[in-house]
Amino acid sequence: MLRKHLLFLSLAVVGLAGCNQHSASLLPRREDGVAAGEIGSRLPDFSAEDLRGHKISSVDLHGKVVLIDFWATWCQPCKKEMPGYQKLVDKYGSRGFAVVGLKFDTMRDVEDPIRFAEKLGVRYPLAIATDDVKQKFGGIEGLPTTLLYDRQGILRKKVIGFEYTDVIESELRPLL
């Protein structure tokens, strides 16, 4: 009888140990095994409606260096980063650099996102990050999350949390 209990307990422990791997195994993977949202992964196919009702699509970003910024109006580090990203667009947009801000929608906004962006001087496209869009980027672990893709659509830099604009710019310049 003790042997049966030990066998059952052993199987239960082994079974539960494998449960922790669900998040990584559910992420979309390329043929080469790179999980979505990880360095070396490709810019996913996505489309969204921006805050003013215009369509944003990954198709429009092909051949450009792209910075995807996941943000929220309640996120203080986001408020610090976004004006710097606008300055990068102003400086490098004519050289094929684009920024798309994807608004994380987990909490009720205390501020209208359009007015929020206007106060910060942000003019690059801003859209709502639906659950589907977040999943295509591999899930979002924290805000802000910044993803920098090269012209071939390969993820070259990923930052979860605040990053200084000059650090992003130093990573951006060689990709242009």
Residue ranges and their predicted role:
Residues R115-R123, I128-R173:
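Thiol/disulfide oxidoreductase modules built on the thioredoxin-like
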Residues G40, D45-V66, V89-Y92, Q135-F137:
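A short beta-strand-turn-helix
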Residues K64-V66, F70-W74, E81, T106, ...:
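Short pre-active-site segment immediately N-terminal to redox-active cysteine/selenocysteine motifs
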Residues K79-L120, A129-K136:
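Structural microenvironment flanking redox-active thiols in thiol-disulfide oxidoreductases
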Residues G37, D50-L51, Y149-D150:
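Short, acidic, Ser/Thr-enriched surface-loop or helix-capping motifs
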Residues M1-D45, K157-K158, E171:
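N-terminal targeting signals for export/organelle localization
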